[in-house]
Amino acid sequence: MALMAALNDPTPTGSVTGPVVGFDLDMTLIDSRPGIRATWAALAEQTGAHIDADLVVTRLGPPLEQEMAHWFPAERIPAMSELYREMYPTYAIEGTLPMPGVHETIAAVHAAGGRAVVVTAKYEPNAKLHLAHLGIAADAVVGNLWAEGKGEALREHGASVYVGDHTGDVRGARTAGALSVAVTTGPCDAAELRTAGADVILSDLTAFPAWLAGYVAQERA
């Protein structure tokens, strides 16, 4: 409960002497594919709709409503999105795994005197459930934002770096004037991320603490 309360408070609890680093959630901090697949499968069973859940999890990142448009007519999308979000805690939280290096990455940000802020397209209450369940100690969470829309939240929190796995995350970083650090753990490969304008490309988060140490040293030089 204490962690959930902390995630609902966007204000720093102490002085910030290091960088504010923004992070995407799905396929950046967490591997949510098993849980998302299970939720879509349950939605298909409940509604009788044909949904290829295996295909769905190959293109995570954009807002839920965009994916819904592949499986439901426009007039049903709001209701189906609401139903999906209601079903999500039952089917998705337990099956989701932390990405390799996630805890070390957040610890590195804190060790540098910084803050870790999650900015995600996911429904915010469900994003917070994931972080609490996996013990990922983010300092703030902002949900329901995608691509350029993430820029406002990143600016509000003073993020100088944004880490994500999708070209939409690169666009969000660019909009905020933040350094774009891309990881190739999601649907976009290194070439796509580079073409989109990523400043740094890492294979996964296990490489992030060393990169951050170099970045902080350079900024303080």
Predicted regions located by residue number:
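N-terminal helical cap/lid subdomain that shapes the substrate entry/recognition surface
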Residues: A5-H103, A112
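Short beta->alpha linker loops
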Residues: R59, P63, L97-G101, K122-Y123, ...
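Substrate-recognition element of Asp-dependent hydrolases with the DxDx(T/V) motif
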Residues: V102-L131, N144
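Well-formed, non-transmembrane alpha-helical positions, independent of function
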Residues: A108, H130-H133, A153, G172-T175, ...
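Acidic, Mg2+-coordinating phosphoryl-transfer loop and its flanking beta/alpha structural elements
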Residues: T120, V163-T206
